[in-house]
Amino acid sequence: MIVRRLAWMNDSRQRLSVSDYVDGVLNCDRALLAQAITLIESLNDDHRATADAVLNKLLIQKQDSIRIGITGVPGVGKSTFIESFGKQLTSLDHKVAVLAVDPTSSRTGGSILGDKTRMQELSRDKNAFIRPSPTSGTLGGVTRVTRETIVLCEAAGFDVILVETVGVGQSEIMVSQMVDFFLALMLPGAGDELQGIKKGILEIADMIAVNKADGEMKNAANRAVMEYQHALIF
């Protein structure tokens, strides 16, 4: 039964025309937006041809959005921060798209795509759209088609695009070339993270925020802020 259902969904996606995808995205049909993103992620030659045609039609649309990249080491609380930030934005009548990039296993090729489960409130918000995607081996903290996915979300009317990176640290600089503002979340007690900082991701961040800076971690967070200020000569 499941196999037949998946086959039907696949056939249905293949039957959609370029106009179907374009109209669906422009009307902010979330199901068609999700299918369009899946289309551009596909490596199938036929899908790629359709995806290119869809993107060419959507690129001519006026795009008036703010793109914000959010990075940080694993465990820093990116997803929790994004949910709180996203809810604040939607409360101000912004439409927020979250592109959450998850790492892909080098052994199995699989990805958990679990970021959305940590944004349960935001995922139910009618003014928010969350799309988890695997890196599929792409370096730089983003996926192979992150730029194209941003274009689709902008065409759908989302005026704030939040790009959450994989969270592997200093190598995630590609996202900085795709966004208007680049935020690096750091943990209290910077320690070894200051090593090699001049060539690292913190050097190109527009803002550094020390997260989890409450309770017993407040003093450590204050020390971390001072260390970053001295290291970066702010």
Residue ranges: model-predicted function:
Residues 182-186, 204-214, 227-234:
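Conserved beta-strand/loop subsegment of P-loop NTPase cores
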Residues 68-70:
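Hydrophobic anchor at the beta1->P-loop junction of P-loop NTPases
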Residues 19-28, 34-66, 76, 85-171, ...:
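Nucleotide-state-sensitive switch-loop elements of NTP-binding domains
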Residues 6-13, 216-234:
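C-terminal accessory "lid"/substrate-recognition subdomains
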